[in-house]
Amino acid sequence: MDSEQSFHTSLDELMMAIEDRLDEVDIDIDVDGGDGQLILTFLSGSQIVVSRQPAQREVWVAAKSGGFHLHREKAAWLCATTGETLDVLLNRVVSEQAGLEVQAFMGIGAELAQ
């Protein structure tokens, strides 16, 4: 298991990577970050919250379709309930709330989960 510092560094990099990917898509999403979380607000007013949970060594995603807890397993962040990787989960929940297909997150988190 990696050190606390490297875990926090990888989470910082993950949050920045999510923001960077959102900047690349042509969807009007307001992104606010701080206090260990990202809040994505859509035109409809709905939100997705991506938050770090260092005590559990997890990333949590809260969306209209539910709450998802992801843990690192080998080279990926995996959802405990759906089995989805972080990139697949983010593509799905952002697509659902944006009302159009989004594939911006493919591969995100895999390189940072090692």
Enumerate the language-model features and the residues they cover:
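N-terminal intrinsically disordered, cationic/polar leader segments
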Residues: 1-114
